[in-house]
A protein has these predicted regions:
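Hydrophobic helical membrane-anchoring modules
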Residues: 1-19, 167, 191-264
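Short hydrophobic beta-strand elements that form part
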Residues: 25-29, 53, 76
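Short, well-formed alpha-helical segments that are part of the catalytic scaffolds
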Residues: 31-46
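Donor nucleotide-sugar binding loop of glycosyltransferases
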Residues: 33-36, 59, 112
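Short, structured coil segments at secondary-structure junctions
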Residues: 48, 70-71, 210
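A conserved acidic beta->alpha catalytic loop
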Residues: 56-64
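Acceptor/aglycone-binding surface of glycosyltransferases and processive sugar-polymer synthases
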Residues: 75-96, 101, 113-197, 224-233, ...
Length: 264
């Protein structure tokens, strides 16, 4: 089983804006994030990004107005397309803007923006095309961060199942904190993926299928009242979708049933 490289959580070694050639774009898939987007933005380390793009999935609040007041590029969907559909817009917009590295940061404050330099560093150094911010790398960190017990159990079960299917040893496949190289986004057919939460699962299986290196870095888990979160019912649907993705991956790999998600 292939090992996963753990990265130390030190931000000093990451390249700042003036020392790198790659354009770094932070994308924020937003939905009803008006109360948290400014605090999240203020916590992003200066000098480690070139542009921030907020894609609002037809929020009921004034997320777009808050983003524009912060001088952020903001795009509003005319109707709600879902979490995965939102990410598709995020990544296509980042590619159009010339991004070489794209960081997905939720605007609800659930993930610590201070880790962005560490999310970018493995791609900058040519060691990864996908970086996952794992809440499960440090024992007990998810519990200390307030992740509900049922989510911790489900996370471990699904990640173990996915690892068995992929032949990998990821500590977490269900983080929403991610970074991608331009090569990744131009190689993986992510536009064919789900518009729902299972999008995040599909891109990991695609990374493995297309042989793109993945690195994990430890991140803190932060659950609080204003943080968006998948409820139990949505979690069941997501879990079934994850198992379905694993099955499609194996059927495609074994040559039994082809899937367009794993074709160039």
């Amino acid at each position: 089983m292939a090992g996963i490289m753990a990265e130390p959580a030190t931000v000093e070694s990451a390249p700042a804006a003036g020392t790198r050639a790659e354009k770094v774009v932070i994308v924020m898939p937003a939905y009803n994030a008006a109360r948290t987007i400014e605090e999240t933005f203020r916590a992003i380390p200066a000098g480690y990004y070139d542009e921030i793009v907020v894609v609002d999935d037809h929020s009921r609040d004034d997320t777009v107005e808050r983003a524009r007041a912060l001088n952020l590029k903001a795009i509003r969907h005319p109707h709600n397309v879902g979490y995965g559909g939102n990410q598709k817009t995020c990544y296509m917009e980042a590619l159009r803007d010339g991004a070489m590295i794209v960081v997905m940061l939720h605007p609800d404050g659930q993930y610590d923006p201070a880790i962005i330099p560490e999310m970018v560093r493995p791609i900058h150094e040519g060691r990864a095309d996908m970086v996952l911010g794992s809440r499960m790398m440090v024992p007990g960190a998810a519990k200390r961060g307030g992740m509900p017990r049922w989510k911790r159990v489900a996370n471990r079960f699904l990640t173990t199942t996915e690892n068995l299917a992929m032949g990998r040893a990821f500590t977490e496949c269900h983080t929403g904190y991610r970074a991608y190289s331009r090569r990744f986004l131009e190689t993986v057919p992510f536009l064919r993926n789900s518009n729902g939460f299972v999008f995040d699962t599909e891109v990991i299986f695609q990374a493995v299928h297309f042989g793109l290196p993945v690195v994990e870095v430890p991140v803190a888990s932060r659950y609080f009242a204003d943080a968006s979160s998948v409820g139990f019912r949505q979690g069941v649907v997501y879990g079934l979708g994850t198992l379905g993705t694993a099955a499609r991956f194996l059927l495609h790999r074994w040559g039994i049933l082809s899937s367009d998600k794993f074709r160039p």
